[in-house]
């Protein structure tokens, strides 16, 4: 099978490269992890400088929380305003590639007009029909998450791969080469029920689904680079009985290390320094 040599923005990613770290910057007050929220100019500058000093390879900025269990949907205008303001500040602060976390075409367009390198679509291009037109025009790097508008039943590994393949077909139709694409298994976004349209409904235990995926990352990669985001996620809280996301650092680091050892190529995290150090040590002794 073909093994793709990929770049996410300007950074080479994949099995022949180090595990990369993507730092999370949220401009949405609704976000589930309050420590990641930066709204004012100075807080954004400070957060970006800190993540760069700690070793982040990318900055991922979001303007709307898509956590399935929260009622946090905002208007496109609000999301766009947050993203545009943050991107301009980040660009003046760092040369790191910027990823914009959005599934809305109008928001993606504004970000790409500003020169953003990467679009991170939690719905794998399946939410907004206009997204394909936008990405075809600007040809950004893409992070495509596993997602379905229909309820997913049966073998979760097989179904996740099928969802990836559908998103890859859609990207191909928009003339995006595979060498500009990274896949994300959407940990935390497969649920029995939720409060928005950005999650995939399943009829089985969502914690078991997430754990199954994390145990079998290599089997779902499709020879593509894989990004995994487990930082402070709900499955950690469920297992450790930690309701407050701020109490999930140890669990997050354990999960992130295992992801890296199991084949993840990029770790998206709220805890850049701790994650980078933990993965560095794990790789040295593995």
Per-segment meaning from a language model:
Residues 174-179:
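Flexible, glycine/charged-enriched surface loops at secondary-structure junctions
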Residues 26-30:
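Short polar catalytic/cofactor-binding loops
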Residues 1-17:
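N-terminal carbohydrate-binding accessory modules
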Residues 62-64:
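Short beta-to-alpha linker loops that shape the active-site pocket of alpha/beta-hydrolase fold enzymes
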Residues 25, 89-93, 97-102:
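Catalytic PLP-binding core of fold-type I/II PLP enzymes
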Residues 4-8, 31-50, 66-85, 89, ...:
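Active-site-adjacent loop and "lid" segments of alpha/beta metabolic enzymes
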Residues 20-24, 57-60, 97-99, 117-118, ...:
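Structural preference for beta-strand elements that scaffold enzyme active sites
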